Structures are given as C-alpha cells and as structure tokens.
Design a protein with these regions (language model features):
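NTP-dependent small-molecule kinase module
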Residues: 2-5, 148-220
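Conserved lysine of the Walker
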Residues: 28
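P-loop (Walker A) phosphate-binding loop of NTP-binding proteins
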Residues: 23
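Conserved substrate/cofactor phosphate-moiety recognition/catalytic segment
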Residues: 37-76
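Hydrophobic anchor at the beta1->P-loop junction of P-loop NTPases
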Residues: 20
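Glycine-rich phosphate-binding loop used to anchor ATP phosphates in small-molecule kinases
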Residues: 64-132
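A glycine- and Lys/Arg-enriched "phosphate-lid" helix/loop adjacent to the NTP-binding pocket
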Residues: 101-172
Length: 220
C-alpha cells in the first residue's frame, strides 16, 4: 500500500481534512487506514519506505538530524498541499505541525545545532504561510512506556536505537504542542493505551467536528 489510498463511500466528514497525531509506534497508520475506510476518505501515510535519511538518522542522529527534519518537512508539506488541492476529504498519518516537536526535542537533547534549529524553524514558518489548516486533529494519547513497547513489537531495525528517555521527552513536548495547536485547530484527545473500535472513534470525531469544539477529551 502506497502513501495514498482512495476508498469509496460518504459520511458527514466527506470533505474534512483529519490529522492523526501521536508518538512513534502508537498506531497512527492503522487508525488512519481504518478511519479512511470507515468514512470514505483518502488515507495519506508517513513517507517511511522511501525515506533516504531514515537509517542514517537512527545510526548517527546528531549528524543527520537537520537533513532528516528538512527532508520530512519538505515531504509532508508536499503531501499537505496535495490534500488541500485535491478538494476531497482525507485522513493524514502525522501532520506537518508535529515535525517541529521532533526538531525541538533534538535541539534540547544536543542532537541538532541551535543554528540548524533556527534555520529549520524559519523554513517551517515560511511554509506555514501557504498552508490551509486541517479541520481537526485526533491525538492518540499513549504513555512513553506503551509507545516503547509497541516499537519493540513491530521490530523495525532502524528504530532499534530509540530510547525510552527520547520518547519521554517527545511526550512532554507533545503535551505542550496539543495545548498550543488547539488554539487554532480543533483537537480531539483519545486515550489509546488500548486500541479502540474504529466506528466508536469515527462517531466521536463526527460529533466533535460538527460541534467545532476545541481541546475535547474523548473517553471511550
């Protein structure tokens, strides 16, 4: 299955742009695929298989952090714009707004030079001027420990060096991100320690989307 998948069907969200956000390995791609199938939307996935920096980044993070983040920003901007230009509803596995979380954590851990980080932030802000926002972001709320467990279970060689400390820092940064982004984009927080039924999640998204509420916590 490629980065994009179109399925048939109609729903109250047929023209909605839904972003699925969360830590590494929590199940974003699986939920994005299921939601797309259920709601009759197009699914867009993270550019993992053809990421030319992925292996190098995990092998020598400090050396490749800037190149990796710029590569991902470029690819995700392209995907984001394709969704907008298509004029159709879509579910996106990780939004472009989350990229800045990873860049800031890399800087804080001394794995990205402050000069490179400032260049990255400037580039991100310039691109942001041309972006229409998603209609809603679904945040899959998972502990760093559960994220680490799921990463181990899927056994991707390139992810073998991901530490629990890195995930803890990411989780803290995500919490700040969710508060900030909810000021401009409706956010639905879904407890995801245990996988939930797609239909139940879709119903919650539909209800919250039509209400246009911000920073809602969905308990399933």
């Amino acid at each position: 299955m490629g980065e994009n998948q179109r399925v048939g069907g109609t729903s109250p969200l047929c023209n909605a742009f839904i972003g699925v956000a969360g830590l590494i390995g929590v199940g974003k791609s699986t939920l994005a695929r299921s939601l797309a199938d259920h709601l009759g939307l197009e699914a867009h996935y993270e550019p993992v298989a053809d990421n030319v920096y992925l292996d190098d980044f995990y092998a020598d993070t400090g050396r490749y952090s800037f190149a990796m983040q710029v590569y991902l920003l470029n690819r995700r901007f392209q995907q984001h714009q394709e969704i907008i230009w298509s004029g159709r509803g879509a579910v996106q596995d990780r939004t472009i707004y989350e990229d800045s979380i990873f860049a800031s954590v890399l800087r804080d851990m001394g794995l990205m030079h402050p000069r490179d980080y400032e260049t990255y932030v400037s580039l991100f802000q310039n691109l942001s001027n041309f972006m229409c926002r998603p209609n809603v972001i679904v945040y899959l709320d998972v502990s760093p420990e559960k994220s680490f467990e799921r990463i181990q279970q899927r056994s991707r060689t390139c992810e073998s060096g991901i530490s629990l400390e890195y995930l803890r820092r990411l989780r803290d940064a995500y919490e700040d991100f969710v508060v900030d982004i909810s000021r401009i984009i409706p956010v639905i927080r879904v407890g995801w320690e245990q996988f939930q039924d797609t239909e139940t999640v879709a119903d919650a998204i539909t209800e919250e989307y039509t209400r246009a509420n911000f920073m809602r916590t969905v308990t399933l």
